[in-house]
Amino acid sequence: MTKKLHIKTWGCQMNEYDSSKMADLLDATHGYQLTDVAEEADVLLLNTCSIREKAQEKVFHQLGRWRLLKEKNPDLIIGVGGCVASQEGEHIRQRAHYVDIIFGPQTLHRLPEMINSVRGDRSPVVDISFPEIEKFDRLPEPRAEGPTAFVSIMEGCNKYCTYCVVPYTRGEEVSRPSDDILFEIAQLAAQGVREVNLLGQNVNAWRGENYDGTTGTFADLLRLVAAIDGIDRIRFTTSHPIEFTDDIIEVYRDTPELVSFLHLPVQSGSDRVLNLMGRTHTALEYKAIIRKLRAARPDIQISSDFIVGFPGETSDDFEKTMKLIADVNFDMSYSFIFSARPGTPAADMVDDVPEEEKKQRLYILQERINQQAMAWSRRMLGSTQRILVEGTSRKNIMELSGRTENNRVVNFEGTPEMIGKFVDVEITDVYPNSLRGKVVRTEDEMGLRVAETPESVIARTRKENELGVGFYQP
């Protein structure tokens, strides 16, 4: 009988990436097949996020539902991973003694051994350590699911913003070696992936080892990824302004594979609040980065993150945030009301902004962002946009759907063989959450670099050291 695995994932794209790796790993080691139905599963895994308000209570609420399944099937294994697991550790079992496995973001590769241990002596396992880069060495080969893929290039963050739990739950910054990253992307390209999204909590701080022992920069890595045949679109998230150096901006000037869209969190437009947040940059420095980016890539669009109602934020501080939003002319952005995360310095600050005031500020900010995003969309009317076709449209299964460089969903009439390829589409209609268009050019008419396969690139550039060990030299 086929053994089944159910994974519920909350949080960021890094968590989505981690969950996909868990599924691949347990399929390779135990033959577990994914199921969307928790009641069918032999193993239930909850991959948690601690960023949002009441994250811990949300976890225990979900575990309470799974407890009923455990009572019906005592052999069911329940595991909790992610940032809440890293933060709470043994406390999870104190409140939910039926949980068998607690693991952190850096120990998910040990899941096969943890499951074997629980199956063997029924003893619970808790492993929330930080074994640095070992996780990536233990994961199976990547499996593509469509024309886009996430690739984690680093873990952790050293910035210690006062409101953020990431350095405590995922550890400090650790970068993967460049050849490991490039080989994973080449494997994905060989399976039909055309767009990669490079992931990290502070992705532009990547400083990975090169094949010759030197340390590469994020700008170096972007150019190496762009050189992989078959990869025609590169995204990355999430960035920190303090690490957004001029060499990265130069990549926007000369590397067309890098999309004309950037998510660069700023959180506030007030220097006083930025200082309280521990952001280590000013609003003016942020705007200087945007000015240089637009000089290098005039059509680039910027999205961001904002926190309203941070302790000590005055009406004047909020107005400075609104001015920054207008000055930069942000596109789609994420915004949240401040809520203290246990264990962070901000949790000890006096939360002195009334709740109703926080809600009002959030409403005003989101209305302005939505207006600007809609204006950006309207500018696209009548233009020709390059779309990576991801599959059938959610609105109409007789149509296709894909995304523009600036992350707009576009629905259009097409043929099945277009899926997984690029098409140029003229935008004919603009809606609040999507665009509509008609195909004006197929990939065969674009002259993209698909003549040389990733396998041939690897074979051509593979070298051996004096011990006969092969390595990939781009």
Swiss-Prot record:
Keyword field contains Membrane: no
Entry keyword set: 4Fe-4S, Cytoplasm, Iron, Iron-sulfur, Metal-binding, S-adenosyl-L-methionine, Transferase, tRNA processing
The TRAM domain, residue ranges: 378-441
Cofactor: [4Fe-4S] cluster
Top enzyme category: transferase
Keyword set includes Nucleotide-binding: no
Cofactor binding, per record: Binds 2 [4Fe-4S] clusters. One cluster is coordinated with 3 cysteines and an exchangeable S-adenosyl-L-methionine.
Recorded superkingdom: Bacteria
CC annotations in GO: cytosol
Domain named MTTase N-terminal: residues: 3-120
Chain residues that bind [4Fe-4S] cluster 1: 12, 49, 83
Subcellular localization(s) per the UniProt record: Cytoplasm
Catalytic activity: N(6)-dimethylallyladenosine(37) in tRNA + (sulfur carrier)-SH + AH2 + 2 S-adenosyl-L-methionine = 2-methylsulfanyl-N(6)-dimethylallyladenosine(37) in tRNA + (sulfur carrier)-H + 5'-deoxyadenosine + L-methionine + A + S-adenosyl-L-homocysteine + 2 H(+)
The EC number(s) this enzyme carries: 2.8.4.3
Single Gene Ontology MF annotation: N6-isopentenyladenosine methylthiotransferase activity
TM region(s), chain numbering: none
Residue ranges constituting the Radical SAM core domain according to the UniProt record: 143-375
Annotated binding of [4Fe-4S] cluster 2, by residue: 157, 161, 164
Entry similarity comment: Belongs to the methylthiotransferase family. MiaB subfamily.
Role summary: Catalyzes the methylthiolation of N6-(dimethylallyl)adenosine (i(6)A), leading to the formation of 2-methylthio-N6-(dimethylallyl)adenosine (ms(2)i(6)A) at position 37 in tRNAs that read codons beginning with uridine.
Assembly and binders: Monomer.
Name of the protein in question: tRNA-2-methylthio-N(6)-dimethylallyladenosine synthase
Natural source organism: Salmonella arizonae (strain ATCC BAA-731 / CDC346-86 / RSK2980)
Annotated gene: miaB
